[in-house]
Amino acid sequence: MEKQVRVRYAPSPTGHLHIGNARTALFNYLFARHQDGKFIIRIEDTDVKRNVAGGEESQLKYLKWLGMDWDEGVDVGGEFGPYRQTERLDIYKKLYKDLLERDLAYKCYMTEEELEAEREGQIARGETPRYAGNHRDLTEEQIKGFEAEGRIPSIRFRVPADSDYTFKDLVKDEVAFHSNDFGDFVIVKKDGIPTYNFAVAVDDHLMEITHVLRGDDHISNTPKQMMIYEAFGWDIPKFGHMTLIVNESRKKLSKRDESIIQFIEQYKELGYLPEAIFNFIALLGWSPVGEEEVFSQDEFIKMFDAARLSKSPALFDSQKLKWMNNQYMKKQDLDTVVELSLPHLVKAGRVGENLSEQEQAWVRDVIALYHDQMSFGAEIVELSEMFFKDHVDHEEEGQEVLKGEQVPEVLRAFADQLEALEAMEPAAVKAAIKAVQKETGHKGKNLFMPIRVATTGQTHGPELPNAIALLGKEKVLNRIQKVIG
């Protein structure tokens, strides 16, 4: 009988949820749910100096915001806990002591200065830097001498000589390493805290993880973890290493690159929809059959096949993300779009926090104009700018429109029509434009474009009668007057 699939997402609380980490979590989530398996969250917090306040909370909060849930973890418990590595130190201690007793690991008393000197010497000789094994076979006398000096040892794993480590990667197919390319590596630091490779191998075994899906940058860790598995006689899980995410210059996405928004929290703050972010991330290095790109979470779960994980780097296309979010925005009701947009108008100082019912209705109508056009909530500030200014600047294309011979006649006639209106309703504005057409004989672009540019400052935009009605008679007449003088 085949084991139930068990996968894990194991973030370090060294920062907030990054798009790359979110993708790792999402692919593990889809892999588990597709196969009726278990999805586990484990917090790898042993690098205490790098942990940041709120890092763990951010990871969990924004995974939930994206629509993911998990079967075991720090917040939901489970039979394989604890799920936070700093709470598992006794487990690691028992196991590394076992390796020491079986001479599969040993204490290394070399100082940081000695290790650095060794490394520099290797580089100077054109060699690949790796631990040369200086303390691999210390005598009792040497050990006593180092301890008398007050040296605190780290513990190194004794890498087997002349051994091949080969595995069939779920993404890359067959991958091979040779043990002679590795020096004996540290499994317990001088402060008694286990290193990443030791703790991960122990946790993955004890938590009965069947598949390890992670980023390509972890592939060199795999043979070290395989060595630890073999040292304990444990079954080795299946590995899959997802390709890197690259920017439009085809360079690895760097957290320091501020030209790209990279943290899930930021997308939420900008008024993106979690379903759209989920959809976009699911296609970063994985592709469905066919050309369709917009799918629900349930559809992704149903069709997720690890065999379709890409072997090529995944391109992070910001414009595509905007397009995708727009697809989801168009499906939302107006209440949701207002909820995503209004806080940004408040933040920009366009409207106050405490609006009257009349003001609320007006703002709602303004937002409704851009419902189908909007890519994300914060975009409303730029899109709706013309409604919050007394005067508008005419773009170059608009200035050309206003040079037309018919423009003064059209605008004067339209101003007269507006003056006569009792209520600025879209239907009344539309009728006023038709009346100008009948009066002046101008139609099509010669009619609509001067009115649009003079009143909105733009050559393109929302339905013109609706926009003019919301701008209000006084503002529109002032703008027309400024054009015709």
From Swiss-Prot:
Q: Show where the record puts the motif 'KMSKS' region.
A: 252-256
Give the location in the cell.
Cytoplasm
Q: What does this protein do?
A: Catalyzes the attachment of glutamate to tRNA(Glu) in a two-step reaction: glutamate is first activated by ATP to form Glu-AMP and then transferred to the acceptor end of tRNA(Glu).
PANTHER family in the record, alphabetically?
GLUTAMATE--TRNA LIGASE (PTHR43311), GLUTAMATE--TRNA LIGASE, MITOCHONDRIAL-RELATED (PTHR43311:SF2)
Per its record, how is this protein called by name? Glutamate--tRNA ligase
- The SS bond pairs are none
Class of enzymatic activity (EC top level): ligase
The family database entries (InterPro entries) matched by this protein are listed as: aa-tRNA-synth_I_cd-bd, aa-tRNA-synth_I_codon-bd_sub2, aa-tRNA-synth_I_CS, aa_tRNA-synth_I_cd-bd_sf, Glu-tRNA-ligase_bac/mito, Glu/Gln-tRNA-synth, Glu/Gln-tRNA-synth_Ib_cat-dom, GluQ/Sye
Highest taxon of the source?
Answer: Bacteria
> What terms describe the molecular function in GO for this protein?
ATP binding; glutamate-tRNA ligase activity; tRNA binding; zinc ion binding
Q: Which organism is it from?
A: Bacillus mycoides (strain KBAB4) (Bacillus weihenstephanensis)
TM spans, by residue?
none
Q: What is its EC number?
A: 6.1.1.17
Name a biological process GO annotation: glutamyl-tRNA aminoacylation
Q: What is the lineage of its organism?
A: Bacteria, Bacillati, Bacillota, Bacilli, Bacillales
